[in-house]
Amino acid sequence: MKKSSFIILSTLFSASVMAQSWPTQTAESKAGTRWWWLGSAVDKENLKWNLHEYAKHGIGAVEITPLYGVQGNEKNNIPYLSDKWMEMLRYTEEQAERNGIELDMSTGTGWPFGGPWVSLKESACRAVFVEKAISGNTLIDITPAEKDAKNAFLHKVMLYAADGTATDVTQQAKSNQLVLQEAQRGAYKVIAIFIKYGVMKVKRAAPGGEGLVIDHFDRRAVANYLKHIEQAFERTKTPYPHTFFNDSYEVADATWTPSLLEEFEKRRGYKLEEHLPELIAYEPKVLSDYRETLGDLLLENFTNQWTAWAHSHGAITRNQAHGSPANLIDCYAAVDIPEIEGFGLSNFGIKGLREDPGKTRKNDSDFSMLKYAPSAAHICGKKFTSSETFTWLTEHFRTSLSQLKPDIDLMFCAGVNHMFFHGTCYSPKEDEWPGWKFYASIDMSPTNTIWRDAPFFMDYVTRCQSFLQWGEPDNDFLVYLPVRDMWKKNINKLLMQFSIHAMGQLAPEFIQSILAIEKAGYDCDYISDKLLAKVSVKGQQLITEAGTHYKAIIIPSGTTITPELKRVLERLSPYVIYGEDTQKMAHFAQPEEMKTSCGLKLIRRRNANGYHYFIANLTANDVEEDVKLAVPFKDAKWFNPLNGEITDADIDDDGIEVNLRSGESMILQVFNTPLKESENACCSNEDKQDEIEIDNSWTLSFIEETPHIDKTYQLDKLQTWESLDEKTRTVMGTGVYTTSFELKKKQLDANWYIDLGDVRESARVYINGQFIGCAWAVPFILDTKGTLKAGRNELRVEVTNLPANRISELDRQGVKWRKMEEINVVDINYQKTLYDQWKPVKSGLASKVRLIYK
């Protein structure tokens, strides 16, 4: 192989090779965060301070979501959409602009959309079926059961004869009593439909936002809801936000809407009311048609209307479609920024990554789930795919920066390029620690100890997203989403919600298809019937209406081919693959050996100069292999998103050397033409050296700590501090480890890295007074960057721990810090609990520190 130097390119590049530099950073390439306003009890001084802190630490967008308040703080609560609330919003907009932060807001408080201005008849509703045998009676009582009777209104009464005929007898029902005519006594069954309104109230609502959830399927209900919000903006002359947000669809009891029967007949070509026995019995065809109709209404009356409304006011929409009883691809495609969600912590077995048994929950968003929103974005030419990121990774106060990286890397590989933390609570600067908290948050805020080194994580995200937002998607295949096969499934209820937590049950066959395609070395995007109808063949490829190219479309095994789908596929022939046929896949596209040989996760994008990859080693193995790429190239560069370094790649023909330790990630850019040689480039002739263990005595002191510790500790060997004494057992903050070591002149010929081993939880490192970087993710290894010298070298390592030991001490002392209203603070299983029994969490340097040759 051609050996190229691994040196940062510090010279300015000419215009012809500017692609070798990092893409321009924007507010969108920075991390965003969901910003909870508890009780909307905000004030201008603290808004200004909070936004400045966020900007200083690298946050580029905030999304205001008002929630319930703080106990004893009721006098400071500000009712949602009141003149005072709108004044605070205007001030926030001004301060956000000054700090270079984009301002988004939820289109309501808590979730889902709703409030006190939603009338009963425009609220979410469900069908109550009253089924009675006739048995020769002429008077039938069709009164709903007591539990269903409140707010239930008679909608339709149908009579069913033994020969299958159905008769509408609604007009014969009075006061829940059905009077049959003599000729009708031969029928065997009557089914009455009542519509029960008000089946859900806004969850976690803020003051002024309490009330009924809207009927998402009803156009007028949605329009009236949005009109009320619009009036507040117009009344107060407040500028609209950059983006309106909608959280995942969680109206589990909404199975009906007043126009459903009419809309069903219009769309499906027959009357649903004539087939209620089949619907109640979950007969596949009727059930599927019912579910498809609800999906159509949600898309048209809610998603499309909401987006059009936002556009009419100069704003855009960001939407979580998951949970919807609709084709997710169509719902994601209907908005400006589709958003997926992570829920829990993935376990990849990465070497050296902290584990916390019993204090984490499994990630329900596997790789196949994460690809729904990016698929819609790619197919429709949308620049951004966002994510609700790090929801419920661990118990409160126990989430480290190192635990964040694998899951954000997985999201990046799925196609996410505009992440939002879940999230950040507005908290007054002077509020006693731990301040205001939201129960399902990693707490990316100034009140968390990880905030000190969070800018280094933010830099990582920004560098990754700047590349992932650049260029165009380059996935190999489209994959048909067989949603009608899913709709036919009997899950013992009418409504089928495609939620993160349910996909394993609803779509196991589809998930296996996606994993098989991934294992074969390819990448794909999911497509719906609606979007597939607009795909054409051009230049021996499939091209979407937005201009995105694919090699072929894969029809997953077991998919029902309807006549309509058959006609579309015939038009796209021969670029159709039935089943997970890897030989046919290889006929259309080259697999990526980084996937098949190394087990790496990656995503590839096209740009004007070639291609670029984001690559993550989410395995327990270190990878050092020569691999062939699936795309042609003449030259290549590695971009390290952890530290910003740009280095030459070792290449040979269409192959490249890949070196990634367990947990590491890199960006690879390959070019269509050879690059000019850098004046700084030279081949390395360094001799490999043995590692050097820094095993001298250490000193340990503390900065920015609570409670304050004056003492300096003398350590014969490295150890974490929670076991030193009672004070260190409960301290949160930064411990400063210092030592010195000797090097001989000949040892300086090596390119040394410092390996900190097991860090709890992040560490800033200084050698001879020079800052060399922050180690916040595994492996905790940093380049010494020429700071070493012959003779005595001074080493300073500033380690910041988690606040877990401090909060457990507050619980032992009986401090009332759980002061939020409503759900307050619960554990990962949504149970109220104390942390007083927590064992001390390791804090500091937990293993040997070495100099290694890399």
Model-derived segments and their meaning:
Residues 31-32, 43, 47-48, 61, ...:
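Carbohydrate-binding surfaces of carbohydrate-active enzymes
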Residues 149-152, 156-234, 652-690, 790-792:
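Extended acidic/polar, glycine-enriched regions
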Residues 1-21:
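Bacterial Sec-dependent N-terminal signal peptides
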Residues 675-676, 800-809:
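Short acidic/polar inter-strand loop motif in beta-rich domains
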Residues 782-792, 803, 852:
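Short, surface-exposed tryptophan/glycine-enriched loops
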Residues 67-175, 180-184, 190-203, 209-214:
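Acidic/aromatic-lined carbohydrate-recognition and catalytic surfaces
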Residues 20-61:
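Mature N-terminal segment immediately following signal peptide/propeptide cleavage
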Residues 741-768, 775, 795-799:
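Aromatic-lined ligand-binding clefts that engage carbohydrates, nucleic acids, or primary amines
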